[in-house]
C-alpha cells in the first residue's frame, strides 16, 4: 500500500544526490471489521466498522458511500496469497442521521458514538439468516471468485460522489481525500513526465500517516532508506557513495496545510495567515513538528520563483497544539535536508475537503522544477 517511483539521473548519484518528494496515500475514514454483518430490528443489515485516523465524523452522515480496498485469496503458495484490488463503484452504504425530533441536541455539540451511531446501512434482509456472510457474497460476486476462496480483506468506506470545481469562477476544488492525494497526484504526474534529469528523482508515497506511520509501509520505517541505498547499489556504488548522496539530497514533504477559515479567522496565527489560491504553504514549528528551517525554506522559495509560484507561511497559534506529518518522521531514518509544505485547504479531515485550483497547479510546477534542478 506504499509506492516509491524513481528516475535515475545522468550525473553520479554520489555527486548530485536525490530530489525527493514525500506524500501519503491514506485518509481518515472507516475500516470494515471482520465478520461485519449486524442485524437490527430483524431487517436492517449494517456493517460493523472502526474509525481510521481522525475524520470529522458528522460529515460522514447521509452521504452515499462506496467500498474499496484489497482482498486476500487462497493461493498455491501460502507465503504468497493472491491479492486482488476491490472497488465497488456504486453507493452501497449510507450512515443515516437520526431526526432532530429524536435528537434535540443535534445542533448543540452532539458527539456520535463510534460503535453505535456511525455504522453504515448496507441493505434490508428478508430472512433471518440472510445476513450471514452477506459481505463475503458481495465481494465474491464483484471479484468473480468463489466465496470459499476469500481469506481476509482490508476494506474501507469512501464517498461515492466525485470531486468537482466550485465557486463563481470555478476556482476551488471540492473533493474527498485532498489530504493527501492531491500531493500524490502532483508528485506522480511530475515524475512520470521528467526527462533526463541530472539528479536522481524519487517520489515516495507512504501509507498509514493518519495513524502514526509506524508500519513497514509507513514513513516511520526503513522503506525510504532501503530503497535509496538499493538505488545507489544498482549504480555500482557502496555505503560511502550512499552517504555522500544523502548529503547532496533534498526532500519536500508535501501534505495539506490549514488555510485561514472565512468564518473562524481567530483560529489562525495573527500574522501567518495562508489563503486559498495565494500560493503554496511553507509550514514551520518551533517544536520541530515540521522539518522546515531557514536553509531548506530558502531552497524551496527559489524553486517556487523559478516555477512562477507564490509562497505563504503557516505557523500554529502559540496557544494551540498543531499536528505533524511524514517529514519529521522520515528524517529520523534518512539524514537529508527537508522542508514541510502543502496546499492551503479548508475542512481538513472532512469527508469532503476544499482547496484552490491554482495552488494544485503550482504544486505540480514546483515539483517539476525540483526534479529538473
Which stretches of residues belong to each language-model region?
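N-terminal hydrophobic/helix-forming segments and targeting peptides
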Residues: 1-373
